């Protein structure tokens, strides 16, 4: 994990994007059904192409969010619901969902969408909100 750049330059973000994409490719090879049972929701959370795209676009912008992605299975299994919200119909990636469910696992925020066509819960994005990332950074730098 030491080879993950911590900066916010375009080059740092590009490296983290590639690491996230490579991680998902490996994860899918180990989880060919592309789903994990979430204990709190009592249903499977599916990982789809949209999951990968949305996550690498958002998580790669922050070092702590990138680290969180590497704990994908653990997060999908153990995150607990904290909120539910309507989708933004003007956002292309959210149009396919009836609603978004916000879950937390430690400081990690997992957003899951209820897909209209299949009624499946689909991983939308994984991030560590800035406040949490700042706290973690302060703790690890002591």
Language-model-derived ranges and their functions:
Residues 1-142:
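Ribonuclease/tRNase effector modules and their secretory precursors
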């Amino acid at each position: 994990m030491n080879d993950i750049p911590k900066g916010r330059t375009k080059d740092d973000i590009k490296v983290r994007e590639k690491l996230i994409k490579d991680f998902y490719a490996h994860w899918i090879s180990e989880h060919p059904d592309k789903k994990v049972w979430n204990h709190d929701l009592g249903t499977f959370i599916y990982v789809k192409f949209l999951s990968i795209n949305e996550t690498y676009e958002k998580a790669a912008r922050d070092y702590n969010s990138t680290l969180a992605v590497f704990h994908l299975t653990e997060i999908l299994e153990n995150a607990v619901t904290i909120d539910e919200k309507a989708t933004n119909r003007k956002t292309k990636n959210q149009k396919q969902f009836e609603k978004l469910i916000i879950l937390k696992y430690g400081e990690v925020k997992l957003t899951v969408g209820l897909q209209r066509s299949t009624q499946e819960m689909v991983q939308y994005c994984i991030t560590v909100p800035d406040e949490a990332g700042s706290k973690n950074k302060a703790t690890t730098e002591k």
